[in-house]
Amino acid sequence: MPQPPNFFQRIRYSIFPGTLRTEKVREGYRRLFNSLLLHFRPRSVPEDTLRWTLTWGLGGMAVVLVFLLLGTGVLLKFVYQPIPEKAYESILHLQRDVLFGRLIRNIHHWSANALIIVAFLHLLRVFFTGAFHTPRQFNWVIGSSLFLVVLFSNFTGYLLPWDQLAFWAITICTGGLEYIPGIGLWLQKLIQGGPEVGPATLSNFYAIHTAILPAFLLILMPFHFWRIRKAGGLVIPRGPEQSSGDRGPSVPAIPDLLLREIVVALVLLASVLVFSMLFNAPLGDKANPGLSPNPTKAPWYFMGIQEMLLHFHPIFALFVIPLLMLIALLALPYINYERSEERRVGKECTG
């Protein structure tokens, strides 16, 4: 005979009317949850994919850093004020008066820089293992787009402290937009919110940094993982005597794969924490539009473009060359590569 609902069950039933969940219903929910997980992780994985040297854990590291940035970013929003008169002072207040405020800012800053490096190395790893060929071409485009989102997330966040270094670095970068043919001046004014870097620029960058770009990340990342799953998982390099379809013995994803991912995540989090305790995020003097530092430098991840300005006309350094590089990056998996047996064996051996 079924037991009558207890006090707490009656409260829940009053809020969510309907039949209380039976064991059969709960089993259905468990199956649904497991089905959703299978979109990103299979029940079993080839044992060879667990080798540390195959991926170096770079994809998982990138995911951990993204969520670490989202978490610390939400905490920073409670203190930061995106107006020129208070932005710099709010950072000082965060570092001096808020409990663990300096540490949280340090973690956010160094995680953002680490994410660029990790994402770039992940892109290189995919390239050198040939993991961008059929049926993974479009996933290469998605991954490249994610890397661009990471770059622009760092770029938009660079201005927010409103110190001299950030202000003039952004002034240099946005000033170069005017050399883009046709839409350069319009694009520059759109991003700056006016003819020069000022309060509207800070407001625009804050909105892009805290709302638009995180939304792109949260949409593209699951899609990226789902495409990996649909393509059959990781590419396993094979020797000349092995069939490319031979994936070897399999092991359960839980716990074999899950434990390795947890270990990588914990080591990464510990490393970021220790680094953030030892090294503070930079903060210069308050931004002064009338006093330009010498030399004025772009953020380190855009210094290559700034260096090209010394050797090429701005149109080529800021528009033509970067555009050609971007087109080449996105078109890379769609090139009709030679598929001879010798080429295939060579690629698999070097992969």
Where are these regions (language model features)?
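Specific lipid-exposed transmembrane alpha-helices and their immediate membrane-water interface residues
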Residues: 156-160, 221-233, 266-297, 318-337
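Membrane-entry segments of alpha-helical transmembrane domains in multi-pass membrane proteins
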Residues: 29, 50-68, 95-117, 134-138, ...
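Central hydrophobic cores of alpha-helical transmembrane segments in multi-pass inner-membrane proteins
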Residues: 33-45, 70, 114-128, 325-334
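Juxtamembrane inter-helical linkers in multi-pass membrane proteins
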Residues: 90-95, 169-170, 174-185, 232-253, ...
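Long, contiguous internal "core" modules enriched in hydrophobic/ aromatic residues
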Residues: 204-212, 219-283, 340-342
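Cytosolic juxtamembrane amphipathic/interface segments immediately preceding
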Residues: 22-23, 37-57, 128, 195-201, ...
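Conserved small/polar residues in nucleotide/adenosyl-binding loops
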Residues: 342-349
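Transmembrane-helix bundle segments that line or gate the permeation/cavity pathway
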Residues: 13-31, 77-83, 110-133, 138-141, ...
